[in-house]
């Protein structure tokens, strides 16, 4: 792969000591050596390009003393410098606590064999090979081609074979002793699938400047992050799926996106929830006249729905008024008679019975809705010469007509009262004070009543 051309090694060459295994809490572990990817190429300024005892002698000469090492990483294709202190007191084997072998780091990441499926009870299963996470990186002999491993297996039929295996889950290398056996009862001599080539290389993590190397001892009890290769560069979790909706629905989606689900309901729903009727109400002028009307009796009904007896006021002090008959010719069509007594006035005392020929009994109006015609009750309607219910629909009253009706009633009271009674005079004075401008209609009605009485 030409890794030696990517970085210039002091002293030249592409050889070094390949780090296969790093023991936890060892001097090599504390120095940050990474298994499989690191190659020790120099120590204390001495280039290690030959397989001899130079490394051992340098380590023994610097026991319990820090020395500098130059390390080449096949992962990052860079050189780095590390300080290590050889020691016999750290509690493990060796001065550094690492397993190494002398080899070339040129193409170290390419000459690997990926362990695929492992058959049960096969030589590979008995040796402890793990499917898909194990990579055979070498043996005691040099292997630079894909056929080198298979040739080595054939020459070790029924004989123990030592292999160096790197595991991506543990991020460490180990020695595996396997005995090839073509008669194990399955296919092949190992009973496992072997992959070689670009698609079966060890996945590497991108190098980050200043990144601290994590070792197996530091990964205890923590989940292992999957490594990435050339086919896992895309992070599927961060990719937004493309829109699958037809192009024609884009405008509809944009218009619907502006709708607010939490918007306030229309004002109509608020009106309906409060119980306000939605039918047309009375004209504004009628509403103004009704603003001062006292509260309605709950038993009363609308004027168009008969009867209204439940809403009529109780006037027990006027029993004799039913004997009076108003002259029919003087009732004005289309005009309703308002009430005689307003709220706050004292009740009228009882008047002596008097029968005036040609005058119908005076009906009693209601205390509310003075703009609608009133309907007489049972016996009063039977005795009346001309029932008011047969009259045409009446419009809203005007003040002059209401004053005329009140003046007519007061004048009639004056004609029939006895000279000794003074209470009706009080009623006449109150009515006349309220309507001083209507003197002429009052006198006309009084003359007509006097002529009729005579």
From Swiss-Prot:
GO BP annotations, alphabetical order: cell differentiation; establishment of protein localization to plasma membrane; Golgi organization; organelle assembly; organelle organization; response to endoplasmic reticulum stress; spermatogenesis
Phosphoserine PTM sites in chain numbering: 214, 411, 443, 451
Expression by tissue: Detected in lung, brain, heart, liver and testis.
Keyword Endoplasmic reticulum: yes
Residues annotated with Phosphothreonine modification: 222, 225, 435
Annotated gene: Gorasp2
Lipidation (N-myristoyl glycine): 2
Name of the protein described by the UniProt record: Golgi reassembly-stacking protein 2
């Amino acid at each position: 792969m030409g890794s030696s051309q990517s970085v210039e090694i002091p002293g030249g060459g592409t050889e070094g000591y390949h780090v296969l295994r790093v023991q936890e809490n060892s001097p090599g572990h504390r120095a940050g050596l990474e298994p499989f990817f690191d190659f020790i190429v120099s120590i204390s300024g001495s280039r290690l390009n030959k397989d001899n005892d130079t490394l051992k002698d340098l380590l023994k000469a610097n026991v319990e003393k820090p020395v500098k090492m130059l390390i080449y990483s096949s992962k990052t294709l860079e050189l780095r410098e590390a300080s290590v202190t050889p020691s016999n007191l750290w509690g493990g084997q060796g001065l550094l606590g690492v397993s190494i072998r002398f080899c070339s780091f040129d193409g170290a990441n390419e000459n690997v064999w990926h362990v695929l499926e492992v058959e049960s009870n096969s030589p590979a299963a008995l040796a402890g090979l793990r499917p898909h996470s194990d990579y055979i990186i070498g043996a005691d002999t040099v292997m630079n081609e894909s056929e080198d491993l298979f040739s080595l297996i054939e020459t070790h039929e029924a004989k123990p074979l030592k292999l160096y295996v790197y595991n991506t889950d543990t991020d460490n290398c180990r020695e595996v002793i396997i005995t090839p056996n073509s008669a194990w009862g399955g296919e092949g001599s190992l009973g496992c699938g072997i992959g070689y080539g670009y698609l079966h290389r060890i996945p590497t993590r991108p190098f980050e400047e200043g990144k601290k190397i994590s070792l197996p001892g530091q990964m205890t009890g923590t989940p292992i992050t999957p490594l990435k290769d050339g086919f896992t560069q895309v992070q599927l979790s961060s990719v937004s799926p493309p829109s699958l909706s037809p192009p024609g629905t884009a405008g509809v989606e944009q218009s619907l996106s502006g709708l607010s689900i939490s918007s306030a309901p229309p004002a109509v729903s608020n009106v309906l929830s409060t119980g306000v009727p939605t039918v047309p109400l009375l004209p504004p002028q009628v509403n103004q006249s009704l603003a001062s009307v006292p509260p309605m009796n709950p038993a009363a009904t609308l004027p168009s729905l008969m009867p209204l007896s439940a809403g009529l006021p109780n006037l027990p002090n006027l029993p004799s008024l039913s004997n009076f008959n108003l002259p029919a010719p003087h009732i004005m069509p289309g005009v309703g008679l308002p009430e005689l007594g307003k709220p706050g006035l004292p009740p009228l005392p009882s008047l002596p019975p008097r029968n005036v020929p040609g005058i119908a009994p005076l009906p009693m109006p209601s205390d509310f809705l003075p703009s609608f015609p009133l309907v007489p009750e049972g016996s009063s309607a039977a005795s009346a010469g001309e029932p008011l219910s047969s009259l045409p629909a009446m419009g809203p009253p005007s003040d002059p007509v209401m004053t005329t009706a009140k003046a007519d009633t007061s004048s009639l009271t004056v004609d029939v009262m006895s000279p000794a009674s003074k209470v009706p005079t009080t009623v006449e004075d109150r009515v006349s004070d309220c309507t001083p401008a209507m003197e002429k209609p009052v006198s006309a009605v009084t003359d007509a009543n006097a002529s009729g009485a005579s």
